[in-house]
Structures are given as structure tokens and as C-alpha cells.
Amino acid sequence: MMIQLIATPSNALVDEPVSIRATGLPPSQIVTIKATVKDENDNVFQSQAFYKTNEAGEVDLEKTPALGGDYVGVHPMGLFFSLKPKKAFHRLMKKDVMNSPLCICLDLYDSVNWLETVRIPSKASQRVQRWFVGPGVKREQIQEGRVRGALFLPPGKGPFPGIIDLFGLIGGLVEFRASLLASHGFAVLALAYFAYEDLPEKPQEVDLEYFEEAANFLLSHPKIQQPGIGVISTSKGAEIGLAMACYLKQVIATVCINGPTTITIFPLRYQDLVMTPIHPALERIQVHDSGALLFRYTTQYLHNKLNSQNILPVEKAQGKILFIVGENDECLDSKLHAQKAMDRLQRHGRSSGRMLAYPGAGHLIEPPYSPVCFVAWFPVLGQPMCFGGDLMAHAAAQEHSWREIQKFFRKHLLQSGSKL
């Protein structure tokens, strides 16, 4: 009987699970299944797990527990979320979402194959294509007034619920989440705010009027549903997202993933308002065993020293807010930040906020099955940064939160009677 490695679907969106089976092997055989992927800069990411075949000589990742390797137990998508860079501090992040998928090569070996130095030929292989964009999604490059970004539109006439997508101090234009949300029926503007085209190379302040201009641009687009938009935001972007929720009437549903609820590092300006930042206590930086920096403890003590000039007035938000926090976030104590905002809402008699806290999850809560990124190079610092996250807990948080994010936007952005 021929040895086969079967992965279905072999061509799908990155947030769709893949079923992996090996057949045609001897019973009770120890095997290795290895996943390998290269990013657009040819950096290699790999994962592997060791399994024992059943009496029929088969391994089914939905039923068979991994005995060892990068994870242990029954984890059908473990090979995907446990992918690690061969060179330290690389982060797997798709830049060109429209023209090519991530191509993951799965290899099956009929022994424990963990030594890089020993070349064993694989018994079977399978390629899996993972797309960040679904069929029919269109991308428009945006240069409107000061606004710079990319707008992803689902197929069809619309109008579609509109969302602005913001990342943190990584800078540039990050498109993979926007294109994926557009594949699920939302019109999403991936918005750059520094280190892109003619935008400032480094942020000196947060000019909220820039983000208001982006919100107005989105709402004026013929394919965007009225009367308001959503925001999905991570890290420093989530601080800006929360500020948009507080001050911009156009924003009616905001997702803040692991961000501060105070103004940090740079001042925030909006019309006549200037909010002064709190600065992290750099003497409280810790160095992880990997050599990466932990910033979690640099802002914890500051909560006692805050004044009204630093704290975002969440009670002013007209719309709904969903805080998503990883309790193992090593960049900041995001749960403490979100809890302070929730307490403030309660004190003002507001029930517009909700917090989803994930024990064991780190800072970079991405779409499902994304490789869990514990540490990565951080360009703004010129240093590696520790993001935190226990592999299994973080992977589970990515899967659960992605469903919750879509439910939240469908509930609060959709006009009655819309089908999505």
C-alpha cells in the first residue's frame, strides 16, 4: 500500500482549519510530520511533531496525539501555530497578501527525524496554500488627502460594514488582517500612520484628526454602509483606536487588542485638546533569557501617578468597545489597562464595554493558526522584544477571539436586514 500524506483543503484561507492524515504505514510505527514555510525574505520557519500510527497504519491529526516535538497531545492545527523561525527573532508576517499565498510544505518521515545534520528522505509530501485574501476581494491603494493605506472590498455591490485596521509601533502598512476580514464580508481600510510613503518616518505625536480624516473617507465611499464604522486595533494602535472611540462620532464599534487605555510615549492632539503622555520607566525593563526585552513592568507602577490629562475618557464613547487581552502579555499589563477602563465605564453608569481576558495568551493575538510569536525583532527599538504567550493558551486565544471579533462587528455594525 502506498504511503500518503493527505491535507484538506490544500488551498484555503489562513483562518480555515486543515485536516491532515498519513496512511499506508506499518501499524505502531513512529513517524515525524514536519511543516516548513519561507517568508517573502526567504526566512525559514519550521515545526515538527512525532506520532505513532494506529493498527491500520494511519495517523489522523484530529484524533492522534503527538508524543513529542513542538507540541504534545491532540492538536489538529499544531504544525501551523507552532511554526518557529530557524533564525532567532523573525516574525512570520505576510506582506503581499493579494498575489501569493503562504506555501507550507508538509513532509512525512517513517522515524523520529529531529537531527538537522542527518538528511532522511521523506516518505510523502504535501503542499498547502494558505491565503490571506478570498476570491473576489479587491484592493484599492489609498492616497486621499493625508490618508495613506489600502482598502479591501469584498465581492458584490455592497454596501458593506466599514472597519479601520490599526497596528502598533511596527510602522508601515500591515494588510494581512484587513484582507482576511474583507474575505468575511467587511470593507476594511488598513491604515498606515508612520514610516510609509510620505508619512512621518517616526511618530512625534498622535494627531487624531488624521484618523478622523480616514474615518470620513471611509464613510464617504459608495460601498461603505452608514452611519458609522468599526475599528480593529492592536498595541499602540489600540490606544489610538480607543481614542477614536472616545472622540469620533463616526466610530461605533471598537476592538482594542492588548493596548494601553492611557496616552503613552507621544502626546495626543485633537482640535484644541492636547493629552500628555506617560513615559515608561525604562529602568524597569527586564531582559528575557532569549535576549529580548520585557516592557511589561515599565508602566505598571504609573497607574498611581495618572491624572485626567493621561487617561482616555472611555465614558465619552458613543459606541461599543471590546477589549481583548492576553494575561501573559510581556509588553504591557494589558489586562490592568482594560480593567481600569471597564471600572471607569461602570463608575459612569455605562455598559458599553466588554473584556475578553485570555490566561496564558501574549501580546500578538493574531488570526487563528498564526504562528505564536513569543519574541521578535522590533525595528523602532533596534532590539528584540518579548511579546509573551504560552503556545497552547495563545493558540486557543487566537482561535476564540477571531470568532468573537467577527460576531462583535456583525452585531454592532450591521443594519437590520443585512445578510452577512
Curated annotation (Swiss-Prot):
Role: Acyltransferase which efficiently conjugates very long-chain and long-chain fatty acids to taurine. Shows no conjugation activity in the presence of glycine.
Position of sequence motif Microbody targeting signal: 418-420
Active site: S235 (charge relay system), D329 (charge relay system), H363 (charge relay system)
MF annotations from Gene Ontology: N-acyltransferase activity; thiolester hydrolase activity
One Gene Ontology cellular component annotation held by this UniProt entry: peroxisome
Keyword Translocase on entry: no
The UniProt record lists the keyword Acyltransferase: yes
Organism: Mus musculus (Mouse)
Cell compartment(s), UniProt: Peroxisome
Protein name: Acyl-coenzyme A amino acid N-acyltransferase 2
Top-level taxon of the source organism: Eukaryota
InterPro entries, alphabetized: AB_hydrolase_fold, Acyl-CoA_thioEstase_long-chain, BAAT_C, Thio_Ohase/aa_AcTrfase, Thio_Ohase/BAAT_N
GO terms (BP aspect): acyl-CoA metabolic process; fatty acid metabolic process
